[in-house]
Each structure stands twice: as C-alpha cells, then as structure tokens.
Amino acid sequence: MAYPFQLGLQDATSPIMEELLHFHDHTLMIVFLISSLVLYIISLMLTTKLTHTSTMDAQEVETVWTILPAIILILIALPSLRILYMMDEINNPSLTVKTMGHQWYWSYEYTDYEDLNFDSYMIPTQELKPGELRLLEVDNRVVLPMEMTVRMLVSSEDVLHSWAVPSLGLKTDAIPGRLNQTTLMAMRPGLYYGQCSEICGSNHSFMPIVLEMVPLSYFETWSALMV
C-alpha cells in the first residue's frame, strides 16, 4: 500500500513485482554511473584549459564509445527480456477471472463457477466508513486465494481502459473486442489497491480496483456463499 510522500515503489507482493524491483535498481545504478561520468567530463571541460584543437583522428576513442554503449544496452536488455517472458508465461492456473471495463466501473466473472459474477463500483466519499480510503474503496472486492496462480482475462465493453494493481506488478490494457490475459500470485494476504490507468472519460479517476487476497479455505467459503 502506498503512503503519503512516498518516493519509491510499493512493496512487492508477488514474484513478478520483486523481479521488477530488482530490475529497477539494476537499471537505476547504470543510469547513475553514466550520469556521474558525463557530469565529471563536463566539469573537466569547464575547469581545464587543456584542449586538443589539432586532433583530427581518434580511432581508440571512437571504438570505446561505440562498444561501451552496446555493452550497456545488452546489460539492460537481457534482464528486461527475462522478466517480459516471465510475465507472459501462464502454466496451469488454479483460477480464471474475467474482468470487463465499463464507463466507469469494473465487472468480474469467475469462469470456473457457474454463476459467480458481480459489478464493482467506487464507494462515494460521503458513504465511506472510518478508516476507508477515499477514491479507492469499492462495494464489491475481488476475493482471490493467495499463493495460487490466478489468470486474469481483461477486456472492455466500451472504450480503452487499463487494469492495474501496482503492488502486484500488474497493468493490462482493456481493449474492446480483444481479450488480454495476465497472471497474478500474491504471497501475502491483505487488500491490494489499483485504479484504471488509461484515460477513459470524465470519471476515469473513479474506477478503483480492490483485490482481497485470502487463504484458500476462506476463498472456498466466500465462493460458496456467493454462488
């Protein structure tokens, strides 16, 4: 969960998000080293009077500044491709949930059950209870089992939306006429908040997402009551 004045990313709750955090730190360190080198060279150019106006050819320097950026790009691309492959891989999901974006709410359907579906609307500010979060609470939470692979099928009934939950490393476009899929696995129980991340109209800011991750026994009890 995010907190006021937070500068970093949210705490990782899924293996994918942990990998994304490691990749973020890896890339940030490379950017920091490059920036430091560039600033050092600029400071030398501004403070020294030594110049080489007669230099017409520098094969060694040209070779270095051609090969070095290529190596840096490879060091960034390899872990990135690995994470992209992990995010795209879906093996034997334990549960499938179909979510549809609407202007301006989400609807969910548990496809493994015969009649388990509902709409999820934001709770208006004037109806919030003490301790609830403004613009993030919904009337129907998406209850899912923790430590199990869940496949999310994402689409839209009208315009472009985007189903995103930052702490799980999820962001999938909801496109009319197209069915996108992603997987999630939460390692800890709790409430995880997200929002529509694609500008979809006047009430775009009022399409929150709330996932309630619970142990399998609680999920089975909840699903039995809902059906």
From Swiss-Prot:
Q: Which GO terms describe its molecular function?
A: copper ion binding; cytochrome-c oxidase activity
UniProt topology in membrane: Multi-pass membrane protein
Mitochondrial matrix-side stretches of the chain, per the record, are: 46-59
Output the Gene3D superfamilies linked to this UniProt entry: 1.10.287.90, Cupredoxins - blue copper proteins (2.60.40.420)
Which residues are involved in binding Cu cation A2? 196, 198, 200, 204
**Which transformation does this protein catalyse, written as a reaction?**
4 Fe(II)-[cytochrome c] + O2 + 8 H(+)(in) = 4 Fe(III)-[cytochrome c] + 2 H2O + 4 H(+)(out)
Cite the record's note on assembly. Component of the cytochrome c oxidase (complex IV, CIV), a multisubunit enzyme composed of 14 subunits. The complex is composed of a catalytic core of 3 subunits MT-CO1, MT-CO2 and MT-CO3, encoded in the mitochondrial DNA, and 11 supernumerary subunits COX4I, COX5A, COX5B, COX6A, COX6B, COX6C, COX7A, COX7B, COX7C, COX8 and NDUFA4, which are encoded in the nuclear genome.
The entry's protein name is Cytochrome c oxidase subunit 2
